[in-house]
Amino acid sequence: MSKVTSSTLIKFKQEGKKFTALTAYDASFAGAFDSEGVDVLLVGDSLGMVLQGHNDTLPVTIADIAYHTACVKRGVARALLIADMPFMSYSTPEQTMNNAAILMQAGASMVKLEGGHWLLESVKMLTERGIPVCAHLGLTPQSVNVFGGFKVQGRDADNAQRILDEAKALQAAGAQLLVVECIPAPLAKAITEALTIPVIGIGAGADTDGQILVMHDVLGISSGYIPRFSKNYLKQTGEIRSAIRAYIDEVANGTFPAEEHTFN
């Protein structure tokens, strides 16, 4: 199979082909996900919660992400590899550039940043310097203390319009991919239709171009709170590779996410 790039995902969007993404943190799981056909792998700052045992993602460092990116890279042959830029690692232009370079040198093909209008100059700067950017809107976990918890975003008209406007602005600034998290399904659909770049949803309904989940949720090994938008595929298949194939198949045929995984 040929390597997945941002151009591949744009082609999928144009063809109406739904694609899948998962988080990954080591070479073994990354290799299994990659060989089964997962299109995008994200070394997420979610590792702070699922690997390190924190209550949120804020303690994660650039060194943490770089280490796990290098691990995942060794297991990947096909999937597009994205690395999260963690909390307070992109506050100034110089810091943003230096930290993004660290992640690219560790093996990432793209970096992901959370935020809206305030990020536009950073997105433009990174893109102009050859570092592809995935933007992230809606529930941005690094802002959990501002939101007052992990809450659905964009439910009122003003905030929905703000998120849509930010999505368009981030695309114009050069973002090649967008993640929307925990927003109402109609808003996610409007964003997906308004943009030419691919949109990946998590807790955002079935009308985005792709879906992403945390691997621990897909495999039923998360402890504590289980998000409404997640699904335990290992429970229904009994085997890891079969679980991943079931996830890919259900995204492709539109049966995941179902209504019970969606916010309105």
From Swiss-Prot:
* Cofactor needs: Mg(2+)
Instruction: Give the signal peptide, or none.
Output: none
Entry keyword Magnesium: yes
Q: Could you tell me which pathway this protein works in? A: Cofactor biosynthesis; (R)-pantothenate biosynthesis; (R)-pantoate from 3-methyl-2-oxobutanoate: step 1/2
The source's domain of life comes to: Bacteria
Instruction: Write down the EC number.
Output: 2.1.2.11
Binding locations of 3-methyl-2-oxobutanoate: 45-46, 84, 112
Q: What reaction(s) does this enzyme catalyze?
A: 3-methyl-2-oxobutanoate + (6R)-5,10-methylene-5,6,7,8-tetrahydrofolate + H2O = 2-dehydropantoate + (6S)-5,6,7,8-tetrahydrofolate
State the UniProt keywords alphabetically.
Answer: Cytoplasm, Magnesium, Metal-binding, Pantothenate biosynthesis, Transferase
> Per UniProt, where does Mg(2+) bind?
45, 84, 114
Cofactor detail note: Binds 1 Mg(2+) ion per subunit.
GO annotation terms (biological process): pantothenate biosynthetic process
Q: Which InterPro entries match?
A: Pantoate_hydroxy_MeTrfase, Pyrv/PenolPyrv_kinase-like_dom, Pyrv_kinase-like_dom_sf
Name the major location.
cytoplasm
Where is this chain's protein located in or outside the cell? Answer: Cytoplasm
Q: Which is one GO molecular function term here?
A: magnesium ion binding
Enzyme active site = 181 (proton acceptor)
Q: Give the GO cellular component terms, alphabetically.
A: cytoplasm
Q: How does it assemble?
A: Homodecamer; pentamer of dimers.
Q: Its family?
A: Belongs to the PanB family.
Function description: Catalyzes the reversible reaction in which hydroxymethyl group from 5,10-methylenetetrahydrofolate is transferred onto alpha-ketoisovalerate to form ketopantoate.
Name listed for the protein in its UniProt record? 3-methyl-2-oxobutanoate hydroxymethyltransferase
